[in-house]
Swiss-Prot record:
InterPro entries: Ribosomal_bS21 (IPR001911), Ribosomal_bS21_sf (IPR038380). Keywords: Ribonucleoprotein, Ribosomal protein. This is Small ribosomal subunit protein bS21. It comes from Anaeromyxobacter sp. (strain Fw109-5). GO terms for cellular component: ribonucleoprotein complex; ribosome.
Length: 64
């Protein structure tokens, strides 16, 4: 769980900025977006295979 303690003399905006950075670093927002809607295991596998194929094609193009 991400948490931020407000230091003496620290503004709310600075504390909020630190909290957002910690959330981003922990991957909380991307995890929330990923879990927002249920995705069947077969769909997950297809997306994963497609992403791997795209990475391979990109890597091939880069090597030429």
């Amino acid at each position: 769980m991400t948490g931020v303690r407000v230091k003496d003399g620290e503004s709310f905006e600075n504390a909020m900025k630190r909290f957002k950075k910690q959330c981003e670093k922990a991957g909380i927002l991307s995890e929330i977006r990923k879990r927002e809607h249920y995705e069947k295991p077969s769909v997950k596998r297809k997306k994963k295979a497609l992403a791997a194929k795209k990475r391979a094609m990109k890597k091939m193009r880069k090597s030429f």
